[in-house]
């Protein structure tokens, strides 16, 4: 049995010779807070190698293996590492009260000349390194270490034995980041030093270590050898919260292991709700790409590929990945992953947006409508009232889909003789609407309309009245929605006066509404239904 000497219960201390970024201090590597530990260590963006990270142990240790994860920068940044050890023990005993009061940022680090180079590695595309001691032998009461199979994604490097004290009597371990790629940031995501107390440690220190180990690890975890590449992923640490629900954490870990790697964002390691294909061939989530673009914008740089740094051009843009999105959705339907709700779709925007909230009278109408069938739509009014899409814009996705389907005009009101409108027809209708709304208030324009044309407009306005939740144009109407009283056409170009909607769905302009309010009781001109003044809503195009 070997122990992870970087766990906080063994009170290691750590120090870096360079400035760290906010929230990514070097103390995160040995922190008791699991959130801080997951952030890892990262220097400021202007720091260049070499960067020295020194870990000081409160007792001399014999190193078995050193695991280093270098993915804290979101990509492959670090390409060169060197390992140094020192046997100088300028510190107090581990189990003394004085050592218990020292903080993690107060290590007594020896001079540079006291360190011995024991390992070196150059990385190409890997981000995890394992330095192992071939001559390590476990001693009682520490059991024999089981053999572990190396992972192909991890670089395995042997430590060099530079003397009797270089690996078996270590007081300080120094990690030197020697090279980074391009403008990369020196970083360490995770650090683990596995070993056992040195032969020179007293029996009292060994007993204390065994006691701490047995108190902070479950029985089944304490008796098994760690697995590559990062053994502390399943260590519950010394927090009681993690000991209370080990089964849920283990279940979540098993589920995450079953997720295909292509479904995970390579930067955040989370399932991608909206995968985007980058010009470099990499696939990341849309939210991750937006965060990268915002980060670039803070430094005055244009949006670029996070992996290559090449700026986007009109001919080289990130594109959605629909086939991968379909596979991710299918996978989530087959597997239940906590916290993943990625199959929803955005609610479609309505053509009309109310400027008021639900009024008490409307709420009473909705409750009363539960027992009255709707003859126009052929469904129960208990599902949705005619004004429900306007007064409930923040309903759920399922409700919004039902409202959209319910408020569609029935087949008896639709002209099925014509096919879908072409672009030229839509453009022509848009020009007619703009022209009619502009000239509608001019007497010289309205005087040219004959009595038959006015009667036709009035009949069309009463038969094909504009309903909320539908588009700005009905199949039988060319000019669009209009005032039920004066027949003035409303459109996005109509900016002179506000528009109001009655509970029956018909629209009124401001002057006509004022006339209706002066003559009580107020009724709709088109359908002759009574209208309460508090039920009138102002709508916007």
Curated annotation (Swiss-Prot):
InterPro entries reported for this sequence: RNF37_RING-Ubox (IPR039925), Ubox5 (IPR039847), Ubox5_N (IPR045696), Ubox_domain (IPR003613), Znf_RING (IPR001841), Znf_RING/FYVE/PHD (IPR013083), Znf_RING_CS (IPR017907)
CDD domains according to UniProt: RING-HC_RNF37, RING-Ubox_RNF37
Domain called U-box: residue spans: 258-338
Pathway recorded for this protein: Protein modification; protein ubiquitination
Zinc finger (RING-type): 483-528
E.C. designation(s): 2.3.2.27
SUPFAM superfamilies (alphabetical): RING/U-box
Tissue: Expressed in liver, heart, brain, kidney and testis.
Catalyzed reaction equations: S-ubiquitinyl-[E2 ubiquitin-conjugating enzyme]-L-cysteine + [acceptor protein]-L-lysine = [E2 ubiquitin-conjugating enzyme]-L-cysteine + N(6)-ubiquitinyl-[acceptor protein]-L-lysine
The keyword Transport belongs to this UniProt entry's keyword annotation: no
UniProt entry keywords in alphabetical sequence: Metal-binding, Methylation, Nucleus, Transferase, Ubl conjugation pathway, Zinc, Zinc-finger
Location, primary (coarse class): nucleus
GO cellular component: focal adhesion; nuclear body; nucleoplasm; nucleus
Compartments, as annotated in UniProt: Nucleus
GO biological process: protein polyubiquitination
Superkingdom, natural source: Eukaryota
Asymmetric dimethylarginine carried by residues: 451
One MF annotation (Gene Ontology) recorded for this entry: ubiquitin protein ligase binding
Entry domain remark: The U-box domain mediates interaction with E2 ubiquitin ligases and is required for the ubiquitin-protein ligase activity.
Function: May have a ubiquitin-protein ligase activity acting as an E3 ubiquitin-protein ligase or as a ubiquitin-ubiquitin ligase promoting elongation of ubiquitin chains on substrates.
Subunit annotation: Interacts with UBE2L3. Interacts with VCP.
Name this polypeptide is given: RING finger protein 37
Organism of derivation: Homo sapiens (Human)
This protein's encoding gene: UBOX5
């Amino acid at each position: 049995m070997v122990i992870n000497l970087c766990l906080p219960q063994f009170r290691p201390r750590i120090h870096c010779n360079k400035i760290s970024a906010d929230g990514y201090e070097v103390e995160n590597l040995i922190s008791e807070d699991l959130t801080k530990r997951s952030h890892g260590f990262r220097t400021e963006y202007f720091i260049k190698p070499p960067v020295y990270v020194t870990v000081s142990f409160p007792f001399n240790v014999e190193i078995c293996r050193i695991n280093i994860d270098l993915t804290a920068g979101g990509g492959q940044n670090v390409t060169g590492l060197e390992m140094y050890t020192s046997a100088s023990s300028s510190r107090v005993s581990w189990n003394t009260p004085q050592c218990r009061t020292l903080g993690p940022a107060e290590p007594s680090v020896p001079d540079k000349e006291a360190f011995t180079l024991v390992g070196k590695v150059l990385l190409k595309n890997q981000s995890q390194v394992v330095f192992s001691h071939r001559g390590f032998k476990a001693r009682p009461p520490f059991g024999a270490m089981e053999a572990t199979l190396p992972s192909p994604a991890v670089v395995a490097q042997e430590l060099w034995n530079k003397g009797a004290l270089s690996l078996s009597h270590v007081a300080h371990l120094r990690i030197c980041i020697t090279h980074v790629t391009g403008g990369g940031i020196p970083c360490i995501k995770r650090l683990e030093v596995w070993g056992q107390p040195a032969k020179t440690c007293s029996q009292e220190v060994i007993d204390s270590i065994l006691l701490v180990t047995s108190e902070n690890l479950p029985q089944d975890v304490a008796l098994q050898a760690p697995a590559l590449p990062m053994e502390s992923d399943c260590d519950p640490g010394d927090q009681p919260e993690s000991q209370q629900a080990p089964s849920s954490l283990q279940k979540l870990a098993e589920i995450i292991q079953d997720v295909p790697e292509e479904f995970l964002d390579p930067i955040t390691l989370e399932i991608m709700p909206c995968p985007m294909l980058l010009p470099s061939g990499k696939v990341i989530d849309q939210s991750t790409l937006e965060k990268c673009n915002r980060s670039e914008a803070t430094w005055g740089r244009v949006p670029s590929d996070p992996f290559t740094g090449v700026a986007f051009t009109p001919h080289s843009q990130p594109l959605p990945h629909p086939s991968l999105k379909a596979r991710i959705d299918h996978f989530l339907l087959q597997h239940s992953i906590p916290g993943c709700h990625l199959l929803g779709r955005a609610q479609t925007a309505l053509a009309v947006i109310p400027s008021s909230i639900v009024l008490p009278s409307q709420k009473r109408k909705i409750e009363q409508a539960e027992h009255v069938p709707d003859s126009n739509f052929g469904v129960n009014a208990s599902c949705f009232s005619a004004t429900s899409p306007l007064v409930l814009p923040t309903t759920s996705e399922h409700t919004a889909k039902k409202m959209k389907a319910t408020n569609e005009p029935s087949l008896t009101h639709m002209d099925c003789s014509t096919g879908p409108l072409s672009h030229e027809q839509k453009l022509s209708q848009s020009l007619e609407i703009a022209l009619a709304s502009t000239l509608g208030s001019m007497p010289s324009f309205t005087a040219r309309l004959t009595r038959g044309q006015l009667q036709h407009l009035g009949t069309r306005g009463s038969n094909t009245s504009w309903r909320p939740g539908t588009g700005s144009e009905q199949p039988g109407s060319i000019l669009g929605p209009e005032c039920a009283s004066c027949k003035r056409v409303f459109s996005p170009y109509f900016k002179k006066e506000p528009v109001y909607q009655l509970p029956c769905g018909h629209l009124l302009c401001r002057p006509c509404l004022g006339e209706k309010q002066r003559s009580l009781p107020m009724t709709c001109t088109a359908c002759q239904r009574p209208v309460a003044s508090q039920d009138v809503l102002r709508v916007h195009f």
